[in-house]
């Protein structure tokens, strides 16, 4: 084994996957990184095989998808793997972000790791939207029309930008070609960012549930955490297989099986479940331009999170106020997901507006307030102890 470590690639693999020192107390919430890497590999491989048979043409895109499902050997399996894999990727991504929020993984010295991760999150949302439009079904066509039309809210140049995106005066053949090219390219950029994310992580090491620097109590990644990762990966494949073989369309819309009809608007235009919270934020603001700004800021605000949290204690494990606010935020995020799937009518509009206000208030107001209260109490306690002594 020592001789093999002389090879640069083997040595690199050994440093990152075998001998990497990890805190001895991390739990299963730290397994989502390996799960995300697994699902990303599935998405790239299944996407490459789908691209071999998909035709990015307005009149042929839907037919090519049907050809994959009906005539390509195991084409149905590849497509369902790709569609279901997208849902799993976002589920793991949201859980990964939630773990980072709860345990303060965005704090120094891991700010760069968090920043790269947020960039991955944004590109993943963009990639998912582009893939959503490619089947050219009734929902994907009108979804592409509505979302790309949001660019027209930009003053002076909005309408020109929309026509530039479309390559014409509506969603057409040029649009599908552009979206297909970008959808094929972006996963490789995400993979490169994921490697950068891992390099930045290993520079300072993983965080831990206690929120303290655990350099004095670390153990090698193999076999301890390597086996632990494999356990959750095997569990994922079991659940993944059950959904693919028994409930492959459980998360899809019925209009996805209908070809695009530019002359007929569907009853409701609803994106995939993992985009619903941001869709709800978009719809909660009547003004088109401000709605678009709010939707993008809901993602980009994660970049500023390290600046908004100035608490002496990293994470919420030992902070009752921070813990309560965190679970309120999670409940609010699930509520936004629910509201995004509903029609624009009373009482969903009002609920969506209040949920959107709380979403931004959590980052801009409640996190700094929680930090201020916690720091004040710690300072008062320290002063009282010094006086007592």
UniProtKB/Swiss-Prot annotation:
State the oligomer form and interacting partners: Fungal cytochrome b-c1 complex contains 10 subunits; 3 respiratory subunits, 2 core proteins and 5 low-molecular weight proteins. Cytochrome b-c1 complex is a homodimer.
Q: Which GO terms describe its molecular function?
A: metal ion binding; ubiquinol-cytochrome-c reductase activity
* Keywords of the record: Electron transport, Heme, Iron, Membrane, Metal-binding, Mitochondrion, Mitochondrion inner membrane, Respiratory chain, Transmembrane, Transmembrane helix, Transport, Ubiquinone
Q: Mainly resides where?
A: mitochondrion
Q: Which organism is it from?
A: Schizosaccharomyces japonicus (Fission yeast)
In Swiss-Prot or TrEMBL terms, this protein is called Cytochrome b
UniProt-annotated binding residues for heme b b562: 82, 183
Q: How is the cofactor bound?
A: Binds 2 heme b groups non-covalently.
Pfam families noted in UniProt: Cytochrom_B_C, Cytochrome_B
């Amino acid at each position: 084994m020592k001789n093999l470590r002389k090879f640069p690639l083997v040595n690199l693999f050994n440093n990152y996957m075998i001998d990497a020192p990890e805190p001895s107390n991390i739990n299963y919430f730290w397994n989502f990184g390996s799960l995300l890497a697994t699902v990303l590999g599935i998405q790239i491989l299944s996407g490459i095989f789908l691209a071999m048979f998909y035709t990015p043409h307005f009149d042929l895109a839907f037919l090519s998808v049907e050809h994959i499902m009906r005539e390509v050997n195991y084409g149905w399996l590849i497509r369902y793997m790709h569609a279901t894999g997208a849902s799993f990727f976002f589920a793991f991504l949201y859980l990964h972000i939630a773990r980072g929020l709860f345990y303060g993984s965005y704090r120094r010295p891991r700010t760069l790791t968090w920043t790269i991760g947020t960039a991955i999150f944004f590109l993943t949302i963009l990639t998912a939207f582009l893939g959503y439009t490619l089947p050219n079904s009734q929902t994907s066509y009108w979804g592409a029309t509505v979302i790309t039309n949001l660019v027209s809210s930009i003053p002076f140049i909005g309408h020109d930008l929309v026509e530039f995106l479309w390559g014409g005066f509506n969603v057409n053949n040029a649009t599908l070609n552009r979206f297909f090219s970008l959808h094929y390219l972006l996963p490789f950029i995400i993979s490169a960012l994921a490697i950068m994310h891992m390099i930045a992580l290993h520079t300072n090491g993983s965080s831990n549930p206690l929120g303290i620097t655990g350099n004095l109590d670390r153990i090698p990644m193999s076999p301890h955490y390597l086996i632990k990762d494999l356990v959750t990966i095997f569990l994922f494949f079991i659940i993944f297989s059950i959904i693919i073989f028994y409930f492959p369309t459980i998360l899809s819309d019925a209009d996805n099986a209908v070809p695009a009809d530019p002359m007929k608007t569907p009853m409701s235009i609803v994106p995939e479940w993992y985009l619903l919270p941001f869709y709800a934020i978009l719809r909660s603001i009547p003004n088109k331009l401000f709605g678009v700004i709010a939707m993008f800021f809901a993602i980009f605000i994660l970049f500023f999170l390290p600046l908004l949290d100035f608490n002496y204690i990293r994470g919420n494990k030992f902070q009752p106020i921070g813990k309560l606010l965190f679970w309120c935020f999670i409940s609010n995020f699930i509520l936004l997901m629910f509201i995004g799937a509903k029609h624009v009518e009373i009482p969903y509009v009002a609920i969506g507006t209040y949920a959107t206000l709380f979403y931004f208030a959590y980052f801009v107001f409640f996190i700094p307030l929680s930090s201020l209260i916690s720091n004040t109490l710690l300072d008062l306690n320290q002063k009282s102890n010094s006086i007592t002594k």
